Amino acid sequence: SAHYLVFDITMFIAVVCFFYCFNGIFLKNDKYWGLRFITPALFLLIFPSIFFTSAGLIATATNYLFPLVAFVIGWYCLEKKGLAWLVLSFPFLILACMQEQFTIFALITFSFYLLKDWFKKKKVNYNYLVGTVLAFIGTVSAMVAPGSAHRNLVETKTWYPGFDKLSLVVKVAKGYMETNRVLFVTSELTIIYLLLITILVLSLLKRHYLASFLSGSVLYTVLSNRLGSTSILTAVQRVIDFQNQQPITKFSFKANLYPITIYAVLLLVITIAIFILFEDKWQATSAIVILAVGYAARMSVSLSPTIYASGLRTFTPLIFSGLIVVIMIYREFIDKIGNRLFQ
C-alpha cells in the first residue's frame, strides 16, 4: 500500500542517516575510512531483517529503530561545534528520549562523556551538559507521567498477573536472569559471538594472551552449550527449567544462586578482557561504560510486566552498544597493528 511505501522510504532514509552519523561519531578520522564501509554489513549482521518485525514492522521500527536513529543523529550533532548544531540536536534527542531505554542510554552515556572531558581537559563540555539535562528530563518524565502508571496497570493484568506484588529486588533479579539467559544460555544474539571473536582475534594479534584466554574461554563456553555439549551452562539451564515450573511470582535467590554467580563471572571476564585489550585506558574505560550502558538499558525492562513478552527487540540498546565496542576494537587494531602490517 501507499502507507507502507512511504514508511519504507522513510526507514531507508533514516538508516542512511544513521550510518552517516555513526561513522561521523566513531570513524571521523580518515585513517578509519575503510571501516566506514564495514559498518552497514555489521549492522545487518547483528540486526537481521526479521529483528524489527517481532511486533509488526511499523510498530517495532517506530518504537526501537527510529529512537535509535534519532539518538545517533542527536549525538552526532552534539559532537559538532557551534550553537546551530546544538539547537539541531534538540528534536532528535527529545524523540530518542521518548523511548525509555534510550533515555537511560543517553543519560548515562552523556554523563560519562561530560565527566571524561572534565577529567581530561579540565573544562565543561556544554554540548554534553545539555544532552545530559535533556536525558534527565526524559527519565523523570517517564517516571512521573500519569500514563506510565496506567499502562503498567493494564500490562500487569495482561502479561504478568502479580507483577505489582514483586519487590524491586526480585524484579531486577528476574531481569538479570532473563537478560543473561538470552546472552549466554540460548545465545540468540549475533553480537555476543561477534564481540567475543573480535576480542579474541585482536588479543592474539597483540599477544595479550590473558585477554585471549579469557575471551576464548567465554566463547568456548557459549558455543559448546549452543551445540549441546556439556558445559558450566548446562546446570544453569536446569535451574532455569526448574524456575519455569514454579509460579511466575515466586523467586528464590538460594535456588538461583548458581546461575546468578555464573552470569556475574562471565560478565566480569568479558569486562577484564576488554580492559586489557586497549592500551589507552580511557578508551578501555569508555568501551566498558558503553557496554554497561547498553546492559543497563536492557535491564530497565525488569521494571515492566512485559519483561517476558517483549522479545529480543528490547535488546536493541545492548546490541547497539556492542556494535560501538566492536568498532572501537577495530580502531585499536588500525592504531596499534594495522599501520605496521601495511607498511
Regions found by a protein language model. Name each.
Residues 1-5, 101-104, 118, 123-274, ...:
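Transmembrane catalytic cores of multi-pass membrane glycosyltransferases
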Residues 9-34, 73:
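Transmembrane-helix motifs of polytopic, lipid-linked glycan transferases
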Residues 21, 73-80, 109-117, 195-202, ...:
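Transmembrane alpha-helices and membrane-interface helical segments
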Residues 30-35, 81-87, 124-125, 208-209:
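Membrane-helix interface segments
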Residues 35-78, 252-272, 297-326:
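Membrane-interface micro-motifs in multi-pass membrane enzymes
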Residues 72, 85-109:
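Membrane-interface alpha helices of multi-pass inner-membrane proteins
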Residues 77-94, 126-130:
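Short hydrophobic alpha-helices at membrane interfaces in multi-pass membrane enzymes
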Residues 214-216, 267-268, 275-291, 295, ...:
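Signature aromatic-anchored transmembrane alpha helix within multi-pass, membrane-resident enzymes
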